[in-house]
Curated annotation (Swiss-Prot):
Family matches, as CDD domains: Ribosomal_L16_L10e
Protein's job: Binds 23S rRNA and is also seen to make contacts with the A and possibly P site tRNAs.
Keyword NAD (UniProt): no
Pfam families linked to this entry: Ribosomal_L16
Keyword terms: Ribonucleoprotein, Ribosomal protein, RNA-binding, rRNA-binding, tRNA-binding
UniProt record, GO biological process: translation
SUPFAM superfamilies given in the database record: Ribosomal protein L16p/L10e
GO molecular function, one term: rRNA binding
Protein name (database record): Large ribosomal subunit protein uL16
InterPro entries: Ribosomal_uL16, Ribosomal_uL16_bact-type, Ribosomal_uL16_CS, Ribosomal_uL16_dom, Ribosomal_uL16_sf
Similarity comment: family membership: Belongs to the universal ribosomal protein uL16 family.
An annotated GO cellular component: cytosolic large ribosomal subunit
Amino acid sequence: MLQPKRTKFRKQMTGHNRGLALRGSKVSFGEFALKSVARGRLTARQIESARRALTRHVKRGGKIWIRVFPDKPVTKKPLEVRMGKGKGNVEYWVAQIQPGKVLYEIEGVTEELAREAFALAAAKLPLATSFVKRTVM
């Protein structure tokens, strides 16, 4: 699963997930893309699960790009531990997603196949998504 090789600090503050995705909102690599229309957090497991659904459906055809990376650690205290005594240990990693962020891209397949594959992948994700095509200027 995806996670940073090394970070400057082990733990991060929770923070806020506000605003719209200004970067990573255009289809840059592939022909078709799955774009987020809601805000939320994607865990490394969810990203991997959707990637597997995509690759299984397109089989050997096409190339897939993952445009998000889980770089924020989420901590959790062990079960039945009293409050206090410091912050818990890192449990998993998440990517913070704003509306308009491109999550996955694909090329080398038909539009119909891409739509089917992205529908399967979107079912694995906790966010509302939409199918977008690359616009040629």
